[in-house]
Amino acid sequence: LALLALLALFVSATNAFIIPQCSLAPSAIIPQFLPPVTSMGFEHLAVQAYRLQQALAASVLQQPINQLQQQSLAHLTIQTIATQQQQQFLPSVSQLDVVNPVAYLQQQLLASNPLALANVAAYQQQQQLQQFLPALSQLAMVNPAAYLQQQQLLSSSPLAVGNAPTYLQQQLLQQIVPALTQLAVANPAAYLQQLLPFNQLTVSNSAAYLQQRQQLLNPLEVPNPLVAGFLQQQQLLPYSQFSLMNPALSWQQPIVGGAIF
């Protein structure tokens, strides 16, 4: 009997199978992902594991979709705010386009210019230099040698390196001085009118400038127009921006009426 009992135990031990412990672990998680009917009924462990895998995969896939939806909503909100701001500025921009198309185009190019964004001072200096380009191009067509000489002086002059617009304005004034001298000899009144933009007295006090002009052009006080032109040039010299920028060069310019003395 003892041998038969041992034999029966041996046979039952060889036919028995071990259930892995990992298959019992998801048993507490399965019901929250499965419908109540399937969780209550009998279902194979493999089917339950498959359903659990599908439910977990669906929950993982839903998270990026929600994030993308939130990002798209935020993007739409930003676009809406930008559109509203643009609509607020459209009337003023359209008025600027009608009044001054050049300023409108300059304003449009300002935002897209990397130099304007990086260095505002350099951009403004570049814009000032562009104002003198037509005069320089005319000088290059009329007198190429003078244009090349001016370009060489532009690179070697400390004033040109420090303040290029002032240097170019000074060079242009030097070219205008002979023509103004001839104009002063021929017509002193027109000479004073040509000096009007460069006279600081005119900008600060127009009445004093007109009084000075009437005194200079009075035939009882100055009977000779050549002497009148000379006095005009000497009295306007302290107020001229040209003499303030370079007094030595201003004194070197031809003196009107010098032949009479």
UniProtKB/Swiss-Prot annotation:
Disulfide-bonded cysteines: none
Keywords, in A-Z order: Seed storage protein, Signal, Storage protein
InterPro entries: Seed_Storage_Prolamin, Zein
Molecular function, one GO term: nutrient reservoir activity
Pfam families: Zein
UniProt entry tagged with the keyword ATP-binding: no
Recorded superkingdom: Eukaryota
Signal peptide: 1-16
Record-stated family: Belongs to the zein family.
Record's function text: Zeins are major seed storage proteins.
Note in the entry: The alpha zeins of 19 kDa and 22 kDa account for 70% of the total zein fraction. They are encoded by a large multigene family. Structurally, 22K and 19K zeins are composed of nine adjacent, topologically antiparallel helices clustered within a distorted cylinder.
Listed name of the protein: 22 kDa alpha-zein 8b
Species assigned in the record: Zea mays (Maize)
